[in-house]
């Protein structure tokens, strides 16, 4: 049996539970045709570079598959039929990667606070506390030092 990495994009308007159900459905197709599904990763809802079938975002999912080619072809056939799947890609690999994929490592990196490891910034502009403003010259605003204009009804 050959080894594959399979990624598919599901519509933005379905829930995460429905994405998990799609993964389980396609996992069942692979197992019914004599294959095995290893690692499954749900990368979550991400923005697309361009619109696909009027969607600006999509749920991404990755599956590591060890199955005969016929099983993968059947899964891809069912994905073509499904309205919930926007795109899919299957790649034959020599061996499956151990540990989390690059996308999951990136997500872990993005969860950390952003300070750049250098601590708070000194000088410059930005979020520094400038303290209270000094009082304005001449009271509140500019209008106190001007004489009032006469109104036509007051004359």
Curated annotation (Swiss-Prot):
What Pfam families does the annotation carry?
Ribosomal_S6
One GO CC term of this entry? cytosolic small ribosomal subunit
Q: Which domain of life is it from?
A: Bacteria
- Which keywords belong to this entry? Ribonucleoprotein, Ribosomal protein, RNA-binding, rRNA-binding
Region ranges (Disordered) = 94-155
Stored InterPro entries: Ribosomal_bS6, Ribosomal_bS6_sf, Ribosomal_S6_plastid/chlpt, Transl_elong_EF1B/ribsomal_bS6
Q: Which GO terms describe its molecular function?
A: small ribosomal subunit rRNA binding; structural constituent of ribosome
Keyword Zinc present in the record's keywords: the answer is no
Gene Ontology annotations of biological process type: translation
Under the heading PANTHER family, the entry gives: MITOCHONDRIAL 28S RIBOSOMAL PROTEIN S6 (PTHR21011), SMALL RIBOSOMAL SUBUNIT PROTEIN BS6M (PTHR21011:SF1)
Q: What does this protein do?
A: Binds together with bS18 to 16S ribosomal RNA.
The UniProt entry's sequence similarity note says:
Belongs to the bacterial ribosomal protein bS6 family.
This one is known as Small ribosomal subunit protein bS6
The UniProt gene name for this protein comes to rpsF
